[in-house]
Structure formats: structure tokens, C-alpha cells
């Protein structure tokens, strides 16, 4: 327990904070509640950022219906790596990060090999609202995979640090 406290203190001394502190001290304090529906939707947020001239990972496509899942190959084209996210997910739930593809299979960043059927199931789960903030129907965003600089490896866990 003492080791955990020392680690937390060392990170805090370097200006690194946990997500709960970030939310309490910054997100809740400096953001209007009326704007939450905009920022809670990754697609709307991305579109607004682009319109404002802010650089964001390239959006390859959006899937809004079960029928559109058929367009996955068209959306990802020849790309070997990409990310699928629920538009209104939270805390990283529902995000599928593909690091490579070969012979009709896909490798996730954790090294798991999956098939097209598993990607389609993930998309269907996203659309059904399994990962959305309110449990309602959602959209799936397919975008460029950001790979963090190795400097963040020791302070981040499962994902790209904010």
C-alpha cells in the first residue's frame, strides 16, 4: 500500500493526475453542462474540431445501421490498422483497436487474432447501444489508429493517454 502511495505522489509531483481528479477539477468546473451532449458524441466533437481547424485523427467512416456494416471493407480500404469506437461510449468501453490484418484475419493491439465476424459483432453491439452513455442506439466511428510515443508507456494503461 505504501508503494502505491509513493507512486501516486511521484506522479502527482510531476503534474500527472488521475481521471477522477481531471474530471472533478477541470471537466466539471470549466465546462457548461448544456454542451455535454455535443462533447459526449465523438463524431460531433470531431466534426466541430475539424471545422475549427484543430487536427484530429482521420475519420475513415461512420456506421449508423446494421445494413451499413456491409461497407466495412469499403471504409477501411487497404489499411492494416484502424480503430472502431462507439460515438457515445465512455471510459474506453467498446473500443476495438486493430493493429494489423492478414489473410482475412485481424490482430488487436493486445495480440488477439479475430475474424471479420467478430468485428461485425462489435459493430452491432455498438449500434445497439451496449456501450453508449445512456444505453440507447449509437453510431460507430472508424478512424486512424494513434500510436502513443513510448515515453508514455510507463504512465499509461490500455490506451492513448489524454
Task: Label the predicted regions.
Residues 1-18:
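Conserved oxyanion/phosphate-binding beta-strand-loop segments in alpha/beta enzyme cores
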Residues 22-129:
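A conserved helix-loop-beta module that forms one wall/lid of the active-site cleft
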Amino acid at each position: 500500500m505504501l508503494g502505491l502511495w509513493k507512486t501516486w505522489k511521484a506522479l502527482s509531483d510531476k503534474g500527472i493526475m488521475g481521471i477522477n481528479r481531471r474530471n472533478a477539477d477541470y471537466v466539471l468546473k470549466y465546462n457548461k453542462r448544456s454542451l455535454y451532449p455535443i462533447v459526449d458524441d465523438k463524431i460531433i466533437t470531431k466534426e466541430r474540431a475539424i471545422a475549427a481547424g484543430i487536427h484530429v485523427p482521420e475519420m475513415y467512416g461512420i456506421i449508423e445501421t446494421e445494413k451499413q456494416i456491409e461497407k466495412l471493407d469499403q471504409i477501411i480500404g487497404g489499411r492494416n490498422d484502424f480503430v472502431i469506437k462507439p460515438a457515445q461510449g465512455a471510459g474506453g468501453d467498446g473500443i476495438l483497436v486493430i493493429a494489423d490484418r492478414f489473410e482475412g484475419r485481424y490482430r488487436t493491439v493486445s495480440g488477439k487474432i479475430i475474424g471479420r465476424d467478430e468485428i461485425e459483432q462489435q459493430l452491432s453491439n455498438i449500434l445497439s447501444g451496449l456501450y453508449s452513455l445512456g444505453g440507447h442506439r449509437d453510431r460507430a466511428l472508424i478512424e486512424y489508429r494513434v500510436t502513443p510515443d513510448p515515453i508514455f508507456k510507463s504512465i499509461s494503461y490500455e490506451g492513448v493517454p489524454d
